[in-house]
């Protein structure tokens, strides 16, 4: 009887967690908009209430898919004609030699990017792996935190976050690469230490690309001139300190707009953050471009900061019934 009760509790806990997938409407910046529009936010049930009418702003039971399962999502992309990079799943329960043998059979092109299998938000992502020797140096560290690792061909270009709600593209942002800014007296190492210790940043030492820093003319002991910016990694995500830049949707090829809407429909999400890499958004995806992943719980904090109008678009597309 006791075991049955435990199982029952776990079941309803999981269902509740699924229900809570969706936009993070509890961001502090939303409170002003709720008050201005006479809206009540029910955090527990993920509902907005206005004039005795409600709007479900969760992704409901659509969230039962594990969107952090990168392998499953990439298979969904391929099955639906959505461009995504080639990949291999490195099973940490197998000998490294066996994994390496199978990886080579996949004929992935360098550079490669390595990610923990079931995380999101740029956590644990390491880019710019140009040879197998560096890959094998990184694997042991990543293996300590996950049972499987996804290794992908790295798509060269700029990273964009597309915010889709109810099949409407609310905004598109270019995610700029993390960088340190010189003060004319501090070394690269000191600036990196300060950057990593920022409580709002989740970048690890392993994610810092010293070769990239070297290509910009600096080493760990270099003093960076005042206000000079130095990119420290090609990992792009707000969690690692990347800054979003609003993109003019008029400069985006129509085929790409349709692709983003298709992705949201395919993964069956009302609220969706899509990560896309291309050299230029004016280039249609079928010539160059790749969907990296989707996020079933996109935060809106950075959107509020960079473009408050996106909240008005969001509220205008919420259906109260």
What feature does the model see in each segment?
Residues 48-207, 253-257:
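Active-site nucleotide/adenylate-binding loops and adjacent lid/helix of ATP-dependent enzymes
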Residues 192-282:
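A long amphipathic alpha-helix within ATP-dependent nucleotide-binding catalytic cores
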């Amino acid at each position: 009887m006791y075991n049955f009760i435990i199982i029952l509790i776990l079941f309803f806990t999981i269902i509740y967690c699924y229900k809570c997938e969706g936009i993070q409407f509890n961001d502090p910046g939303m409170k002003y908009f709720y008050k201005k529009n006479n809206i009540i936010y029910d955090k527990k049930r993920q509902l907005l209430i206005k004039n005795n009418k409600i709007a479900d702003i969760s992704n409901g039971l659509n969230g039962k898919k594990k969107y952090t399962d990168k392998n499953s999502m990439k298979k969904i992309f391929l099955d639906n004609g959505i461009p995504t990079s080639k990949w291999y799943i490195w099973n940490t329960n197998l000998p490294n030699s066996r994994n390496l043998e199978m990886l080579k059979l996949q004929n992935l092109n360098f550079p490669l990017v390595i990610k923990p299998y079931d995380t999101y938000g740029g956590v644990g992502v390491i880019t710019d792996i140009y040879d197998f020797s560096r890959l094998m140096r990184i694997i042991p560290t990543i293996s300590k935190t996950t049972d499987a690792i996804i290794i992908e061909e790295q798509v060269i270009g700029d990273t964009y976050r597309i915010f889709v709600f109810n099949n409407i593209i609310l905004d598109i942002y270019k995610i700029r690469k993390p960088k340190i800014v010189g003060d004319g007296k501090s070394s690269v190492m000191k600036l990196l230490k300060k950057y990593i210790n920022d409580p709002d940043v989740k970048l690890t030492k392993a994610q810092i690309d010293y070769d990239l820093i070297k290509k910009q003319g600096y080493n760990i002991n270099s003093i960076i001139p005042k206000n000079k910016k130095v990119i420290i990694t090609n990992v792009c995500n707000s969690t690692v300190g990347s800054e979003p830049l609003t993109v003019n949707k008029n400069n985006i090829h129509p085929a790409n707009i349709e692709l983003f809407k298709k992705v949201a429909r395919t993964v069956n999400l009302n609220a969706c953050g899509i990560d896309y890499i291309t050299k230029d958004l004016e280039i249609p995806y079928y010539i160059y471009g790749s969907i990296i992943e989707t996020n079933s719980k996109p935060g809106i904090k950075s959107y509020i900061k960079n473009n408050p109008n996106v909240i008005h678009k969001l509220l205008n597309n919420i259906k109260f019934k």
